[in-house]
């Protein structure tokens, strides 16, 4: 790609403009309670979760989070990325893997070091939630910023009765989820522990013509006790073509998934964010941010402020990475997202 200015000048030019726009931003994200927030690896999803409480958004500590959706929609990717970000902050990670399929090489792609986590393969619902109640920090670990527990996925958990083939209808599992969550959720809040679980969806045969066509296994307790529920939906498969020895070949290199804030007591619900997940890379935040700016600003080229990055998404990504503009791009997205959200803030006189 032909560049008309040197990378250093381009970077400094955009950064100066970004500083001015930040100073002019009269309504940055407000927050209350905890100031400990974990990123999902996606700027847009972080903002959708709590952009009105924290400037950069993210998942606050001390809550239960459920990530659910159909198979292949990116649930495990999101789970591993959050766990990897916890490790980067120096936090402790306990990873329950009832499906027994965590790929260690795959997890390293997200910064998650398998050797440094407490890894278990539980069989029952009780095993998972009792570990939360019994996980008391050691005296020499008081400087650990956050303790986190992950479970992938809740749908794979059983009960002692079911294992002994005494639960023919499968009703005991829903009861155990309700009992265990009732005992565990207060401890999660008191100890400021973050618990993130993935779950599958099943067809709801009793939905009728107007009811919800799907449901999550394990009864209603998980959704009831979760402070944040994220639903992942596969939007499309990302394809690329390459020419090898004069022949054109096409491969699927990743997926685009939509994450809906299905329930939230963290901030406003019913926001959504698009995630681009590449098989050999993980969550492509640069791609998502560039497409967001191009869509909301309705420009013909990819750009950051006054800086044009070209019409090709691959060229634009390369320019951002070459000039080290990742943080500048992120700040631009946050500023514009806040400007849009501010227009939907109720300006009426407070009732109380």
Describe the role of every protein-language-model region:
Residues 88-90, 110-117, 165-172, 211-219:
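A short alpha->loop->secondary-structure connector
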Residues 102, 157-158, 204-205:
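Catalytic P-loop NTPase motifs of RecA-like helicase/translocase cores
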Residues 123-193:
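Phosphate-binding/switch loop-helix module in NTP-utilizing enzymes
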Residues 1-30, 38, 65, 237-352:
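C-terminal regions of RecA-like/P-loop NTPase motor modules
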Residues 117-123:
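Short acidic-hydrophobic, aromatic-tinged amphipathic segments that line or gate anion-handling sites
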Residues 3-116, 129-134:
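The Walker A/P-loop phosphate-binding site
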Residues 170-295:
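Phosphate-binding/switch region of NTP-binding enzymes
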């Amino acid at each position: 790609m032909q560049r008309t200015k040197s990378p250093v000048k381009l970077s400094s030019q955009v950064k100066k403009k970004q500083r001015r726009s930040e100073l002019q931003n009269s309504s940055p994200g407000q927050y209350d309670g905890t100031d400990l927030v974990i990123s999902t690896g996606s700027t847009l999803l972080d903002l959708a979760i709590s952009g009105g409480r924290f400037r950069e958004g993210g998942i606050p500590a001390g809550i239960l989070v459920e990530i659910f959706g159909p198979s292949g929609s990116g649930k495990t990717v999101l789970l591993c990325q959050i766990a990897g970000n916890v490790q980067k902050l120096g936090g402790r990670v306990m990873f329950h893997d009832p499906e027994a399929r965590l790929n260690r090489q795959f997890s390293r792609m997200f910064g998650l070091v398998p050797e440094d986590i407490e890894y278990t393969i539980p069989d029952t619902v009780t095993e998972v939630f009792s570990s939360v109640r019994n996980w008391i920090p050691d005296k020499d670990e008081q400087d650990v910023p956050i303790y986190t527990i992950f479970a992938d996925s809740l749908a794979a958990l059983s009960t002692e009765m079911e294992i002994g083939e005494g639960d023919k209808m499968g009703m005991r599992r829903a009861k155990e989820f309700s009992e265990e969550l009732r005992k565990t959720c207060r401890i999660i809040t008191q100890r400021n522990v973050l618990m993130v679980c993935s779950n599958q969806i099943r067809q709801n045969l009793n939905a009728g013509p107007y009811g919800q066509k799907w449901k999550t296994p394990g009864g209603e307790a998980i959704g009831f006790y979760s402070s944040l529920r994220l639903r992942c939906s596969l939007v499309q498969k990302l394809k690329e073509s390459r020419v090898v020895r004069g022949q054109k070949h096409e491969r699927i290199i990743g997926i685009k998934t939509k994450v809906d804030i299905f329930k939230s007591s963290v901030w406003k619900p019913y926001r959504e964010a698009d995630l681009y997940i590449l098989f050999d890379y993980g969550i492509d935040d640069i791609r998502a941010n560039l497409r967001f700016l191009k869509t909301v600003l309705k420009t013909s080229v990819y750009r950051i402020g006054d800086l044009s990055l070209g019409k090709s998404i691959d060229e634009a990504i390369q320019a951002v990475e070459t000039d080290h503009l990742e943080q500048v791009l992120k700040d631009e997205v946050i500023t514009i997202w806040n400007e849009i959200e501010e227009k939907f803030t109720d300006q009426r006189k407070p009732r109380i």
